[in-house]
Amino acid sequence: MLLKILITMLSLGAASSVYSVEEIKVAFGNALAPWVMPATNNGIIIDIITEALEPAGYKVVPIYYPYLRRITQYRNRFVDVSSDINVNTMTEESLAGFLSDDAYTYENFAFALKVKGYKFKHLNELGNLSLLSWQGAIAHIGNEYAQMATNNPYYFETNRQESQIQMLFLKRVDVVQLDEKIFDYFRSKVEQNGIVDTTEEVDRFPLFGASSNGFLFHDKKIRDEFNRQLQRLKDSGRYAEILNRY
């Protein structure tokens, strides 16, 4: 009888180890729909890292912060991973860790009301206009953008993309700068909520180029596994399905 109990306990222990998972806390900006949607714990970025790591035995735990605070929480090791990191961000914020391969790409545009009649060809043309961007854009984009923004007395940043939409259509600013998917999402949301009329025509200027991003890990082993699984998602076609879902 004692032997039977011992065998049962060993079997349960083995089963427990097989099905055990390691929780990975991941910091996300809290206002980046459809890339990050805190209310439903999904979105393009969340789905990518979840579907990459969970088959490898990791449980992704999303934690949402005002955009710049995700960096502070990562630096202080309150989280294991931070989203929305590139080489510029690591350099400007003096971050240590292991950066993943490019995992997703923002398409940032300058948006202006068509009635303004702007014909922007270069981002330097924004230097004397009121421009509302997203929090951390100077560090993240860097280079010519950082120079233009730093020298522009009418340049501001916010961690609320919804407020960018409102300010543009209320004619409080000349230009807003943000990702095209985020703009379209919050434009529709603001209109549906009856907050501001967003039906006025808008011009979109691709002045900034694509902004590739990845995840910054404290643990190299987990970063390496993520890179392998990310490639699997891309090779299988699942990555494209995630992008198209939203």
Give the positions of each predicted feature.
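Extended ligand-binding regions for polar small-molecule ligands
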Residues: 46-55, 116-117, 123-130, 212-246
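Extracytoplasmic small-molecule ligand-binding "clamshell" domains
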Residues: 21-94, 157, 226, 245
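Ligand-binding cleft/hinge of the Venus flytrap
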Residues: 49-58, 100-102, 125-127, 135-159, ...
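Short helices/loops that flank or line small-molecule/ion binding pockets
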Residues: 68-80, 98, 161-184, 189-190
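Acidic, polar ligand-binding/catalytic clefts
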Residues: 50, 63-125, 138-139, 201-208
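Short loop->beta-strand "edge-of-pocket" segments that line small-molecule binding or catalytic clefts
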Residues: 22-37, 123-139
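A ligand-binding cleft/hinge motif common to bilobed small-molecule-binding domains
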Residues: 84-94, 145, 174-202, 207
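Periplasmic-binding protein-like
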Residues: 29-31, 105-109, 193-227
